[in-house]
A protein has these predicted regions:
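Enzymes that bind and transform nitrogen-containing heteroaromatic metabolites
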Residues: 2-11, 16-20, 25-27, 43, ...
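Proteins enriched for Cys/Gly/acidic motifs involved in redox and nucleic-acid/cofactor modification
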Residues: 22-24, 115, 130-157
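Short beta-strand scaffold segments in enzyme catalytic cores
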Residues: 29-38, 156-157
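Short Asp/Glu-rich motifs
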Residues: 32, 110-111, 137-138, 206, ...
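Zn2+-dependent cytidine deaminase-like catalytic core
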Residues: 34-133, 305
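Residues that form or flank phosphate/diphosphate-binding pockets in enzymes
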Residues: 53, 82, 109-110, 136, ...
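Short low-complexity, flexible loop/linker segments enriched in glycine and/or proline
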Residues: 114-116, 140-143, 209-211, 329
Length: 346
């Protein structure tokens, strides 16, 4: 049956797309397959910003055999000029007969326009098969274009009783090596990492990707976003050693400190000794950063929760009890009754 074949090839396109998840940010992960007479004659995936799109690679491999073939792709092909030519023009030029797409591209530059133009040029279009899988794969990209702000994933490692450190702030190690390895993977898949001066100063943290299995798949380290209201982080800190990594420091004061050229100071409004998070998120969005991985202590996390800015939590829970005097993963104090609870779903 045609439906079964369509599902089969779209599933393969999604698997191809996943190969780019570590290097494609801020672009979406896309895989494409060209099929003719029940045979795959071309396939490809988008590897990194500025490189050929999945459809372009697949159609190039298919060559002149593309005429009359079916193109399977998990995201609507682009129709605008960016760092690469529009895929739409090539699909029409290669005389593709049918295009099967999982989901529309929410980017306002596309968002259904390519589908209309494909149909206008006599190409049969099928939309919506494996849509949920496709949307999930590119949930951060989709969120950015639907809501005009980065998708925020907040990570916390804690004990069974919700503690992230003992009463002296000792936290090495509450969680397991497997958890820490998973954090490396999450960093590698992120467009940026957000933390605070307190977190960085405490451990002289680098907050980067170090595992070879993930590092080898990256083009660059994810940019680091630091909340440092009074610019307390010493210039000798490890985070400043890698001058190839983009660092944004959000502060409310002026300074004569001499930072390297990879460091951007962002003057940020503050209130009650707290930086304005909504200003920061809006600024980050303007830098074409479509998702943020939060690694911080309880104060920033609590502020993000209070401002309704956390889209997803990632909890690593260790089978340990640290007791009432240990430090909680949040510092929210305005909730005292069940009726004041903040609801989430698993």
């Amino acid at each position: 049956m045609k439906m079964d074949r369509d599902l089969y090839y779209l599933h393969k396109a999604l698997l191809l797309a996943k190969k780019g998840i570590y290097s494609v940010n801020p672009n979406p992960a896309v895989g494409a397959i060209v099929v003719k007479n029940e045979k795959i004659i071309g396939m490809g995936y988008h590897k990194s910003p500025g490189s050929a799109h999945a459809e372009q690679i697949a159609l190039k491999k298919a060559g002149d055999n593309s005429a009359g073939a079916t193109l399977y792709v998990n995201l609507e092909p682009c129709c605008h000029h960016g760092k690469t030519p529009p895929c739409l023009d090539l699909i029409i030029e290669k005389k593709i007969k049918r295009v099967v797409i999982c989901q529309k591209d929410p980017n306002p530059l596309v968002n259904g326009k390519s589908i209309k133009l494909l149909k206008k040029n006599g190409i049969d279009v099928k939309l919506g098969l494996l849509k949920n899988e496709a949307v999930s794969l590119n949930k951060k990209f989709n969120h950015y274009h639907l809501y005009n702000r980065p998708y925020i994933l907040a990570k916390t490692g804690m004990s069974l009783d919700g503690k992230i450190a003992d009463y002296r702030w000792n936290s090495k190690w509450i969680t397991s090596p497997a958890s820490r390895n998973d954090v490396q993977k999450e960093r590698a898949m992120s467009s940026s990492i957000l933390s605070t001066s307190s977190t960085i100063i405490k451990d002289d943290s680098r907050l980067n990707v170090r595992k070879k299995e993930y590092l080898s798949k990256l083009k660059i380290q994810p940019p680091l976003l630091i909340l440092d209201r009074k610019l307390k982080i010493p210039l000798s800190s490890k985070i400043f050693k890698d001058t190839s990594r983009q660092i944004y420091i959000f502060s409310s004061i002026n300074t004569n400190k001499k930072y390297k050229s990879n460091v951007i100071l962002v003057k940020t409004p503050s209130n009650n000794q707290k930086l304005n998070l909504k200003f920061i998120i809006k600024y980050v969005a303007s830098q074409n950063i479509n998702n943020i991985f939060v690694e911080s202590g309880p104060n920033l996390l609590s502020s993000l929760i209070t401002d309704n800015l956390v889209d997803e939590f990632l909890f690593y829970i260790a089978p340990k009890i640290l007791g009432n005097n240990s430090k909680s993963f949040n510092s929210i104090t305005h909730i005292n009754k069940l009726s004041q609870k903040i609801d989430y779903h698993i």
